[in-house]
């Protein structure tokens, strides 16, 4: 991103601290933390430096939160690579194996919480009652740490399904959100090829989000 004016040495120092702090902790610093680190007399002085950076297009100040700072410098060079779209999945192979990836969509994974790891095209209407429709792209966060009631992506043999999870001991019930579909019942003692691939964190359909 090009700036209206170059940063002063002090502004660059503030920006470098913001960047280092975010990379280290995963979140922006407060004004008090900026003041303490850089030797300002008060958080108000840090606020003035942030406003100067915002005027030059280096940061965006987000209202309503003490850590509401977003870095904008070089944002054009930091575009996300995108999310892989998963197609047919072969039994016994990782869902993100190269041969399963049909393409890549330029979607920022951080738009979803938790972060999305891949997209899955929805086939059928088994989840229509909660707005997951045939043809939607489902954003999925890869994890095996799931809870009852969550909408998950599961694999049974070479079939991938999106359902709401209910687990009772060694028996898993995968519930549809459509009265026309019966639950899928999986007995973990009998079914060897059952994998939980992740949880649904959003959908892409004409800019609508789940």
From Swiss-Prot:
It catalyses: Hydrolysis of Ala-|-Gly bond in repressor LexA. The record marks 91-92 as: Cleavage. GO terms for biological process: DNA repair; DNA replication; negative regulation of DNA-templated transcription; proteolysis; SOS response. The keyword DNA repair applies. Keywords: Autocatalytic cleavage, DNA damage, DNA repair, DNA replication, DNA-binding, Hydrolase, Repressor, SOS response, Transcription, Transcription regulation. The active site is at residues 126, 163. Transmembrane segments: none annotated. GO terms for molecular function: DNA binding; serine-type endopeptidase activity. Its EC number is 3.4.21.88. InterPro entries: LexA, LexA-like, LexA/Signal_pep-like_sf, LexA_DNA-bd_dom, LexA_repressor, Peptidase_S24_LexA, Peptidase_S24_S26A/B/C, WH-like_DNA-bd_sf. Residues 31-51 bind DNA. Coiled coil: none annotated. SUPFAM superfamilies: LexA/Signal peptidase, Winged helix' DNA-binding domain. NCBIfam families: lexA. Belongs to the peptidase S24 family. Homodimer. Represses a number of genes involved in the response to DNA damage (SOS response), including recA and lexA. In the presence of single-stranded DNA, RecA interacts with LexA causing an autocatalytic cleavage which disrupts the DNA-binding part of LexA, leading to derepression of the SOS regulon and eventually DNA repair. This is LexA repressor. It comes from Actinobacillus succinogenes (strain ATCC 55618 / DSM 22257 / CCUG 43843 / 130Z).
């Amino acid at each position: 991103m090009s700036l209206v004016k170059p940063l002063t040495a002090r502004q660059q120092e503030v920006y470098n601290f913001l960047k280092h702090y975010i990379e280290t902790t995963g979140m922006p610093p407060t004004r008090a933390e900026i003041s303490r680190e850089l030797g300002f007399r008060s958080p108000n002085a840090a606020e003035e430096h942030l406003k100067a950076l915002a005027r030059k297009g280096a940061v965006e100040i987000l209202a309503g939160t003490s850590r509401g700072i977003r870095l904008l410098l070089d944002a054009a060079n930091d575009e996300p690579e995108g999310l892989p779209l998963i197609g047919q999945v072969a039994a016994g192979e990782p869902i993100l194996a190269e041969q399963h990836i049909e393409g890549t969509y330029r979607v920022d994974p951080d738009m979803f919480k938790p972060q999305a790891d891949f997209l899955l095209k929805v086939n059928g209407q088994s989840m229509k009652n909660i707005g997951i429709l045939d043809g939607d792209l489902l954003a999925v966060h890869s994890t095996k740490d799931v809870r009852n009631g969550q909408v998950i992506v599961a694999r049974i043999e070479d079939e991938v399904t999106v359902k709401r999870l209910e687990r009772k001991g060694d028996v898993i019930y995968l519930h549809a959100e459509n009265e026309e579909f019966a639950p899928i019942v999986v007995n973990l003692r009998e079914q060897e090829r059952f994998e939980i691939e992740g949880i649904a964190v959003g959908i892409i359909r004409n800019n609508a989000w789940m």
